[in-house]
Amino acid sequence: MASVASSTTLISSPSSRVFPAKSSLSSPSVSFLRTLSSPSASASLRSGFARRSSLSSTSRRSFAVKAQADDLPLVGNKAPDFEAEAVFDQEFIKVKLSDYIGKKYVILFFYPLDFTFVCPTEITAFSDRHSEFEKLNTEVLGVSVDSVFSHLAWVQTDRKSGGLGDLNYPLISDVTKSISKSFGVLIHDQGIALRGLFIIDKEGVIQHSTINNLGIGRSVDETMRTLQALQYIQENPDEVCPAGWKPGEKSMKPDPKLSKEYFSAI
């Protein structure tokens, strides 16, 4: 975990965003990447996924899995907490994941490095759609192993020059690599993170995760759709969402007989 000794206080804003107090640091310096290679395999996360999960047995069958290994970043487990420095609105702040519990959903995504190629296309795409995530009571957090100084230099670089421009959410600095490691996305021999993305609900539980190799960008549309489906089934626990489900479309009852209502309509 990336621990910080100083205490934090939340900042109130018109959009009710949960960011801790700003910290003061010196002027930025820039780190540039010249080459980036893809790993042959990532064993750190796969080893934990060998464990099988079990459905809870109640009077009404639950289709929400509770993972058995609490120390792994598995769907159904609590997300590993962290506190770290970040850049937001061209200033330095502290972000603590557990501050969002009981308040917001979180889209937490990892990317390899600043000043690279696929990364700015993803980061700016999430920023451009941030107002849609806000309407779903969701905060977006980006993470890489770069310093806050590198993050700041990148947001101060124009998009047409490969920069980010102003972003609508924080970029977190994981210089110790502890956050990437705790979420199982760290490529140990390269010291950078795979493109991991986690949807964390208001209880701090991981409800969705994807991991892409370095050369494959992620879809904001699919992230949004998955988030909407998650929120729907949490509000309607007697229903499940079929493939490609979008808000307004027909859901399904997870029952051998009642599900026929859905299948007969398609």
Swiss-Prot record:
<keyword id="KW-0150">Chloroplast</keyword>
<comment type="subunit">
    <text>Homodimer; disulfide-linked, upon oxidation. Interacts with the plastidial thioredoxin CDSP32. Interacts with the plastidial NADPH-dependent thioredoxin reductase ANTR-C.</text>
</comment>
<protein>
    <recommendedName>
        <fullName>2-Cys peroxiredoxin BAS1, chloroplastic</fullName>
        <ecNumber>1.11.1.24</ecNumber>
    </recommendedName>
</protein>
<feature type="compositionally biased region" description="Low complexity">
    <location>
        <begin position="1"/>
        <end position="16"/>
    </location>
</feature>
<dbReference type="GO" id="GO:0009570">
    <property type="term" value="C:chloroplast stroma"/>
</dbReference>
<dbReference type="GO" id="GO:0140824">
    <property type="term" value="F:thioredoxin-dependent peroxiredoxin activity"/>
</dbReference>
<keyword id="KW-1015">Disulfide bond</keyword>
<dbReference type="GO" id="GO:0009507">
    <property type="term" value="C:chloroplast"/>
</dbReference>
<dbReference type="InterPro" id="IPR036249">
    <property type="entry name" value="Thioredoxin-like_sf"/>
</dbReference>
<comment type="similarity">
    <text>Belongs to the peroxiredoxin family. AhpC/Prx1 subfamily.</text>
</comment>
<dbReference type="InterPro" id="IPR000866">
    <property type="entry name" value="AhpC/TSA"/>
</dbReference>
<feature type="active site" description="Cysteine sulfenic acid (-SOH) intermediate">
    <location>
        <position position="119"/>
    </location>
</feature>
<dbReference type="InterPro" id="IPR013766">
    <property type="entry name" value="Thioredoxin_domain"/>
</dbReference>
<keyword id="KW-0934">Plastid</keyword>
<keyword id="KW-0809">Transit peptide</keyword>
<feature type="domain" description="Thioredoxin">
    <location>
        <begin position="73"/>
        <end position="232"/>
    </location>
</feature>
<dbReference type="GO" id="GO:0045454">
    <property type="term" value="P:cell redox homeostasis"/>
</dbReference>
<dbReference type="GO" id="GO:0010319">
    <property type="term" value="C:stromule"/>
</dbReference>
<dbReference type="GO" id="GO:0051920">
    <property type="term" value="F:peroxiredoxin activity"/>
</dbReference>
<dbReference type="Pfam" id="PF10417">
    <property type="entry name" value="1-cysPrx_C"/>
</dbReference>
<dbReference type="Pfam" id="PF00578">
    <property type="entry name" value="AhpC-TSA"/>
</dbReference>
<keyword id="KW-0049">Antioxidant</keyword>
<dbReference type="InterPro" id="IPR050217">
    <property type="entry name" value="Peroxiredoxin"/>
</dbReference>
<dbReference type="GO" id="GO:0009579">
    <property type="term" value="C:thylakoid"/>
</dbReference>
<comment type="function">
    <text>Thiol-specific peroxidase that catalyzes the reduction of hydrogen peroxide and organic hydroperoxides to water and alcohols, respectively. Plays a role in cell protection against oxidative stress by detoxifying peroxides. May be an antioxidant enzyme particularly in the developing shoot and photosynthesizing leaf.</text>
</comment>
<dbReference type="InterPro" id="IPR019479">
    <property type="entry name" value="Peroxiredoxin_C"/>
</dbReference>
<dbReference type="GO" id="GO:1901149">
    <property type="term" value="F:salicylic acid binding"/>
</dbReference>
<feature type="transit peptide" description="Chloroplast">
    <location>
        <begin position="1"/>
        <end position="65"/>
    </location>
</feature>
<dbReference type="GO" id="GO:0009941">
    <property type="term" value="C:chloroplast envelope"/>
</dbReference>
<keyword id="KW-0575">Peroxidase</keyword>
<feature type="region of interest" description="Disordered">
    <location>
        <begin position="1"/>
        <end position="25"/>
    </location>
</feature>
<dbReference type="GO" id="GO:0009409">
    <property type="term" value="P:response to cold"/>
</dbReference>
<dbReference type="GO" id="GO:0004601">
    <property type="term" value="F:peroxidase activity"/>
</dbReference>
<keyword id="KW-0676">Redox-active center</keyword>
<keyword id="KW-0560">Oxidoreductase</keyword>
<dbReference type="GO" id="GO:0048046">
    <property type="term" value="C:apoplast"/>
</dbReference>
<dbReference type="GO" id="GO:0005829">
    <property type="term" value="C:cytosol"/>
</dbReference>
